[in-house]
Structure formats: C-alpha cells, structure tokens
Amino acid sequence: MHGRRHLAASLTRALIQAPSRSISSTPSLLQTLDPSVPSPPAAGAGRLAELRRRLQADAPSLGDFTYSVEVGTRQRPLPKPKWMKETVPGGAKYAAIKAKLRELKLHTVCEEARCPNLGECWSGGETGTATATIMILGDTCTRGCRFCNVKTSRTPPPPDPDEPSNVAQAIASWGLEYIVITSVDRDDLPDQGSGHFAETVQKLKALKPEMLIEALVPDFRGDPSCVEKVATSGLHVFAHNIETVEELQRNVRDYRANFKQSIDVLEMAKEYAPPGTLTKTSIMLGCGETPDQVIRTMEKVRAADVDVITFGQYMRPSKRHMPVSEYVTPEAFEKYRALGVEMGFRYVASGPMVRSSYKAGEFYIKAMIEAERAKGTAADSSA
C-alpha cells in the first residue's frame, strides 16, 4: 500500500495543465435588498457599499451563470496538448463502411460519440483490419450523462424489430472476426432493451458461429434478469463501463447510474455467463479525479473479478458538456497500465486516445478468448 501511495504521488507530478478548481463567483442577495429596509449602522455602511460595488462589478452574465451551473467553473477550455492530435477520417474502407451503415440504417457509437479513433478504426489503421462498434436500440438515449454526445429523450422511438437481422447482415458483409455491439440506455422499455440486445447477439452467432462478440451494455438499472439475459446470449466479452472514479459518479454520469450498481452488474455477469466469458470496464481520465481515487477504484473493480480494464482521456464533445479538467500525460497512462497488470487484470489498455471499444485491445482479447476455448476443448477431451 505504501508503494501505491508513492505511485499516486508520482502520478500527480505526471499530470499537466490541471486548472485550479476555484468556484465561480455568484451575485449576492445583497443586490436585491428592499430599499425600504433600514440601513445598517453608519460604521458598516461604507463597507457594505463597497461590497455591493465589488459584487456588481464581478457579477456574471446570464451566459456565465448557466455555464457555471452546467460545469461548475468559469475557466476557459484547456488547449489540447500535442499528443491529443486526431487523424482526419478517410480512405476506401472508411467510405465503404459509412455507406453500408447508411444503407442499412444502422448507427455506430463511433459517430454518435465523436470518437477520436473513428478514422483509424474504419479505415483499418496499421493492421488493415477495419473495425466499427455498432450501436443498437436506436440513436436516442433516455439518460443524459454530462460527457456523452448521444442525443437524449424521455420517450425515444421504439426499437426497430428488423435491427438484429440488419446488424447480422452488415457484419457478415464486412467479414470481421471480432465485433463490438453497444446500445443507448432504454429506461423506457420494460426489459431495458435486454431482450433486443440478446436477440442481436444470437442472430450474429447463428449467421457466423466463429465470430467473437463483445457486448458493451448499459446498467439495465441493475436488474439481474436483464443482465442474465445478455450474459447468456452467446457473447464472449461482457463489457460495462463505470466511466469514472467512485467519487465523481454524480458529477459525470446520469443520476440513475452509480458506482455500486455498475459493479453489481459486472459481478452478476461473471456469475451468469458461461465459464471463460471475460468481463471488461473502462474509465475516463481528466474529469477531475486524483491518482489516489483512480487507484482505489481500480482495486474495487479488480475485487469484482473484472478481467479487462481500459483508460482513456476524456474529450469534451461540445461546449454543452462538462469541460476537461486536465490532460493526463502519456507517462501517467503508462503507470496506470503497469499498476493494472500488477493488480492482476488480464489485459489493460491505457493511453490518451484509447476508448473502451478501441480495436488495439481487441487483438489481445481475441487471443485470450481463443486460449479459453483451447482450455475448454482440452478439458472436454480429458473427460
């Protein structure tokens, strides 16, 4: 534990461009005092007049006020450091995938969340293997997390009953070996959309039995029956993101989400899913967390027997969303990766541009799944 405290201290030194966390000034109720109210004693009248003058001079505009309520600060956005430069999307594979998605009326979290890796993943990047994360259950979420760019509504359109078949058709036409399926939250549906999710996985498995499937799911409000339905649908990786450290959950996520509920979902998935199924979660950095908080959160996630964890830099989608608190250095990301391996996570992806569905980790996860399959085959043979 002493070593981890030392690591936390070194991580703090590795972080750069962290703005001060001062709270913006707000106008005082003294400005609205009724003139008929008797004045204070003469001795304090001068100080009160000066206070009123200073408050009025420093009073924020309406825009400043709404901004401070929205994000808790009046500071200007931080400039992006050199390591956060993005690649412009392009290439033949990128165009082909985009055209196919439009044709089949499918949505990807890559586009909806404005993922910085969209161009690399869709075009194939260094490996030449194009990857996309399909988003099912529509493109409108019933929740409003402060970091997310997906549009929201209390009453989104009903799910498309043909979507599971369309997803299977799209994936088959791409010839992929590993696919990630995710979804918006659907608190408006009786089963939170878990049945639709499970059906999509099952149709994919029927069409391509050898395909490796990762499902990045919402919390289903912690409903065990919903978690079980998806965990037993035939997937290989059950992923659910805790998004941020325990202490910042209410600041970052929708009020219906919380740390304990997410940990419970990951634990239930491990219990319900067949042996060899991996569980996975992701944490954004740069939301105002401290290294100590990150380490404590990692310990609790590992205690839930989660196999894979990823770390990436939070990037503000628009001015309507919470601001970036700090840009975490690549060196700090590497220290979190090393610590995760030391803690016993089977795989850790950690870097400024890493996202929970980023393809760089899928090759390692694929190898882990195939190793589990080999174990199962060997066990069956010996029996």
Curated annotation (Swiss-Prot):
Compositional bias segments (type: Polar residues): 25-34
Chain intervals for the UniProt region annotation (Disordered): 25-44
Record organism: Zea mays (Maize)
Reaction(s) catalysed by this chain's protein: [[Fe-S] cluster scaffold protein carrying a second [4Fe-4S](2+) cluster] + N(6)-octanoyl-L-lysyl-[protein] + 2 oxidized [2Fe-2S]-[ferredoxin] + 2 S-adenosyl-L-methionine + 4 H(+) = [[Fe-S] cluster scaffold protein] + N(6)-[(R)-dihydrolipoyl]-L-lysyl-[protein] + 4 Fe(3+) + 2 hydrogen sulfide + 2 5'-deoxyadenosine + 2 L-methionine + 2 reduced [2Fe-2S]-[ferredoxin]
InterPro entries (UniProt xref): Aldolase_TIM, Elp3/MiaA/NifB-like_rSAM, LIAS_N, Lipoyl_synth, Lipoyl_synth_mt, rSAM
Annotated residues for binding of [4Fe-4S] cluster 1: 110, 115, 121, 357
Annotated gene: LIP1
Superkingdom of the source species: Eukaryota
A GO CC term assigned to this protein in UniProt: mitochondrion
Protein name (database record): Lipoyl synthase, mitochondrial
Signal peptide per UniProt: none
